[in-house]
Swiss-Prot record:
Root EC class: hydrolase
Keywords, comma-separated and alphabetical: Carbohydrate metabolism, Hydrolase, Manganese
InterPro entries: FBPtase_class3 (IPR009164), Metallo-depent_PP-like (IPR029052)
Enzyme Commission code: 3.1.3.11
Source organism (scientific name): Staphylococcus aureus (strain JH9)
Required cofactor names: Mn(2+)
Regions of compositional bias (Basic and acidic residues) in chain numbering: 298-307
Domain of life where this protein originates: Bacteria
Any GO BP: gluconeogenesis
UniProt name for this protein: Fructose-1,6-bisphosphatase class 3
Keyword ATP-binding: no
GO molecular function, one term: fructose 1,6-bisphosphate 1-phosphatase activity
Cysteine pairings via disulfide bonds: none
Length: 654
C-alpha cells in the first residue's frame, strides 16, 4: 500500500473541500457567516436529571423550560396584560392543543373568536421575535413549523415604514383564520416558543428506574432538537440487558416487578412475560410479604388479588434467578472484590441464617425452593430456558433497539461541556480524596482514565451482543453494583439483605467518600483540573442523589463549584426531599438553579395558568456575557473557520 504524506493528504482534503466552495465569494460568505455567529450570545442550556420514568412531570418541565417560558412572557407583556391574560398565554404556550379547546368553548360568536385569534397570533409572533433575538434567521427557520414558515417569517420581519403593506399583513392573518388554519398556526407557534427558550438539553442520567413511562421519555428525547445524555446507573442496567447481560436483565425485571411496572416490559416494549409467569406459578407462593409489589403513586385503582398474586410470584422467581446469576461473575472476576455478595452460598439452609460481613442474621420471608444447596448458582432447566427466551425477546424488540441505540449515540459516562463537568454518579475517590484505582484486564486505572475504560467496555458489550459472559458484559453489570463504579457510588448493594433480613443495620449501603468530599471546594477544583477543565471557571454538575432540602441540605456545594440537580422527578423520593427536585439553566448571563414543586396535573395549569414550579436561585452572574465563541460549539466553528481560511489562502489569495 502506498504511503500518503501529510502534505498530499492536506492537498486531497482541500481539493474535496473546494468542490463545495468553488469561488472565492462562496468561501468568503461562509467565513463571514461563521465568524459572525461566534459573536452571538451563547444559547440557554437546560440541565435535568434522574427522570426515573416520570414522563408527565418531565414533559412539563420541558414545556415550561424550567420557568423560562413564563419569564420571557413576563418580560414582554407584564405591563400590558392582566394576570389572567398572562396566565392564559402561558398555558397556551405549554399545552396549546388543550388550552385552545378550553378557550374556544368560552366564545359565543365567530366574530369574538376571530378577534382573539388576531390578538393571540400577534402576541405569539412578538414572543417568538423576543425568544429568537440571539439566533440567526437560519436557526430560527429550523424552529418554525415547516408548513407555515413563509407566513411566520413575513409577520416576524414585517416592515410597514411607508404604509405600503398594511393591508398585505392584515390579509395574511385574516386568510389564515378564514381558511381554518389559525389553530394549527397557533399550536406551531407555541411549540416554536418552547424550542427557542432552550438551545440545548443535558440529561444527567437515569431516564429509567421505577417510574411508569421511560419509553415515552425516550421517544420525546429522540425528537428533541439538541441534547446529550450522561448515563445513569439505571440506564446502564437497561443497556446491559439489551447488550446480553442476563444478570442485568434479571435486575431490571425484578425492579419492574417490585414497583408494579411490568407493563413497561409487556406493553411498551412488547416482550412476552408468560414463560416467566409459568415458572413463577409453579414454584412460588403468593403470600410472601417481602415480594408484594409497591403501590404505584400514579395508579388510582388497586391491583386485583390475582394481579398482585402473579406479580408477587414473578418478583420472587426473578430475584432468585438474579442472585444465582451473580455467583459465576463474582467468581470469575476476583478483581471485582465482591466475594461478600455470594449471598446464596453464605446462607445456612438448616438454621435459616446468613453470615455477611462477619455478622450472622436470621432470615425472614425466604423463597429458596429452587436453590440447590450444594450448588446455589445452578439454574433449573426452566430458569435457564426462561432467561434465554427473555434475552432473545429483549434483543429482538424493535422499539427497545431504537431506544438503546439512541442512548449509546447521545450518551456517555461523563461530559466536559462549556467548561463544566457533567456526571451522573461520582468520581471514585478514597477518604483522602485520591482517585481510587481499579484493575481491568491486568491494567490499573483511576479517575478520568477509569471512566474512559468503563465507557469503552459498555460500547464494546453493546456492539457484541452475542457475547453474554465476556469481560465487557460483566463490567456493565459492575457499573450497576460495583464498589469502584462511577455510577453506583457505594461500597455494596444490599438487595438480598433488604428482602430477607429484618435488622435494618444490614441494609445500609456505605457511600463513596466522594459524596462528603464534594462539599470541599479544593477537592472539586482538583477534580476539575484532573478532567482538563479550568477550576476557576468550571463546575461539576451532578445527579444521582436526591437533595434533602427538607433537612436543610443545599444543592449548591463547595462555594458554587458543585451543583447537585437530582430532579426528584421520582414521586417515591419527594417525601424525603420536600420538593420535586432541581433543574438548572445556564444562559449567556450566568446560571440559575430552579426548585420545583410537585407536578400534580396539567388540568390546574390549563384552568388557572398557575405553574407551581419554580423558585429560582442565581448561582452566579457572568462578569462578561458569554458568547458562542466561549463554548464547545464555538471551538468547533473556529476549527471550521481555520480550515476555510487555509483553503482561501491556498486557492485564492496566494
Amino acid at each position: 500500500m502506498t504511503q500518503i504524506t501529510e502534505k498530499e493528504l492536506k492537498k486531497k482534503y482541500l481539493d474535496l473541500l473546494s468542490q463545495n466552495f468553488d469561488t472565492p465569494e462562496k468561501l468568503a460568505t461562509e467565513i463571514i457567516n461563521l465568524e459572525s455567529i461566534l459573536e452571538l450570545p451563547k444559547g440557554t442550556e437546560h440541565f435535568v436529571s434522574d427522570l426515573h420514568g416520570e414522563y408527565e412531570a418531565f414533559q412539563h418541565v420541558l414545556r415550561n423550560g424550567s420557568g423560562n417560558v413564563r419569564a420571557k412572557i413576563n418580560d414582554i407583556f407584564k405591563e400590558r396584560l392582566s394576570t389572567k391574560e398572562l396566565n392564559d398565554l402561558t398555558a397556551l404556550v405549554y399545552y396549546p392543543e388543550d388550552k385552545l379547546k378550553l378557550i374556544k368553548s368560552d366564545f359565543q360568536s365567530c366574530g369574538q373568536l376571530n378577534v382573539w385569534y388576531i390578538t393571540t397570533i400577534e402576541h405569539l409572533i412578538e414572543l417568538i421575535k423576543y425568544c429568537s433575538s440571539k439566533y440567526t434567521r437560519s436557526k430560527l427557520r429550523k424552529a418554525l413549523p415547516k408548513q407555515y414558515v413563509y407566513i411566520i417569517e413575513e409577520l416576524l420581519y414585517k416592515s410597514n415604514e411607508y404604509q405600503n403593506k398594511k393591508s398585505y399583513y392584515e390579509t395574511l392573518v385574516n386568510q389564515v383564520i378564514e381558511l381554518k388554519q389559525a389553530d394549527d398556526l397557533i399550536i406551531g407557534l407555541a411549540y416554536s416558543v418552547q424550542r427557542l427558550v432552550v438551545d440545548h438539553l443535558h440529561v444527567v442520567g437515569d431516564i429509567y428506574d421505577r417510574g411508569p413511562q421511560p419509553d415515552k421519555i425516550m421517544d420525546t428525547l429522540i425528537n428533541y432538537h439538541s441534547l446529550d445524555i450522561q448515563w445513569g446507573n439505571h440506564d446502564v442496567l437497561w443497556v446491559g440487558a439489551y447488550a446480553g447481560s442476563k444478570v442485568c436483565l434479571a435486575n431490571l425485571l425484578r425492579i419492574c416487578a417490585r414497583y408494579d411496572n411490568l407493563d413497561i416490559i409487556e406493553d411498551a416494549y412488547g416482550i412476552n412475560l408468560r414463560p416467566l409467569l409459568t415458572l413463577a406459578e409453579k414454584y412460588y407462593d403468593a403470600d410472601n410479604p417481602a415480594f408484594k409489589p409497591k403501590k404505584r403513586p400514579d395508579k388510582h385503582e388497586r391491583l386485583t388479588q390475582r394481579e398482585e398474586s402473579q406479580i408477587t410470584k414473578i418478583h420472587q422467581a426473578i430475584a432468585m434467578i438474579q442472585f444465582k446469576l451473580e455467583i459465576p461473575i463474582i467468581k470469575r472476576r476476583p478483581n471485582f472484590e465482591m466475594e461478600e455478595r455470594l449471598v446464596l452460598e453464605k446462607v445456612n439452609y438448616d438454621t435459616n441464617e446468613i453470615t455477611v460481613y462477619g455478622n450472622t442474621y436470621p432470615l425472614k420471608d425466604t423463597c429458596f425452593q429452587t436453590i440447590n444447596r450444594n450448588n446455589p448458582a445452578e439454574l433449573l432447566p426452566e430458569e435457564e430456558e426462561v432467561m434465554n427466551k427473555l434475552l432473545l425477546s429483549f434483543q429482538q424488540s424493535e422499539k427497545l433497539r431504537r431506544h438503546m441505540s439512541f442512548l449509546m449515540r447521545k450518551g456517555s459516562l461523563y461530559l466536559p461541556y462549556n467548561g463544566n463537568l457533567l456526571i451522573h454518579g461520582c468520581i471514585p475517590v478514597d477518604e483522602n480524596g485520591e482517585m481510587e484505582s481499579f484493575e481491568i484486564d491486568g491494567h490499573t486505572y483511576s479517575g478520568q482514565e477509569l471512566l474512559d475504560v468503563f465507557e469503552y467496555h459498555v460500547r464494546k458489550s453493546f456492539d457484541e451482543k452475542e457475547n453474554t459472559d465476556d469481560l465487557s458484559t460483566d463490567l456493565v453489570w459492575y457499573l450497576w453494583t460495583g464498589k469502584y463504579s462511577s455510577l453506583f457510588g457505594k461500597r455494596a448493594m444490599t438487595t438480598f439483605e433488604r428482602y430477607f433480613i429484618a435488622d435494618k443495620a444490614s441494609h445500609k449501603e456505605e457511600k463513596n467518600p466522594y459524596y462528603h468530599l464534594r462539599e470541599d471546594v479544593n477537592m472539586v477544583r482538583k477534580m476539575l483540573s484532573d478532567f482538563g477543565l479550568n477550576p476557576d471557571e468550571g463546575r461539576i454538575i451532578n445527579g444521582h442523589t436526591p437533595v434533602k432540602e427538607i433537612n436543610g441540605e443545599d444543592p449548591i456545594k463547595a462555594d458554587g463549584k458543585m451543583l447537585v440537580i437530582d430532579g426528584g422527578f421520582s414521586k417515591a423520593y419527594q417525601s424525603t426531599t420536600g420538593i420535586a427536585g432541581y433543574t438548572l439553566l445556564y444562559n449567556s448571563f450566568g446560571m440559575q438553579l430552579v426548585a420545583h414543586q410537585q407536578f400534580n396535573a396539567k388540568e390546574k395549569i390549563l384552568s388557572e395558568g398557575i405553574d407551581e414550579l419554580s423558585i429560582k436561585r442565581v448561582v452566579d452572574k457572568e462578569l462578561q456575557r458569554k458568547k458562542i465563541r466561549d463554548t464547545n460549539i464555538g471551538k468547533e466553528l473556529q476549527a471550521q473557520i481555520d480550515i476555510l481560511k487555509m483553503l482561501m489562502h491556498d486557492r485564492y489569495l496566494d
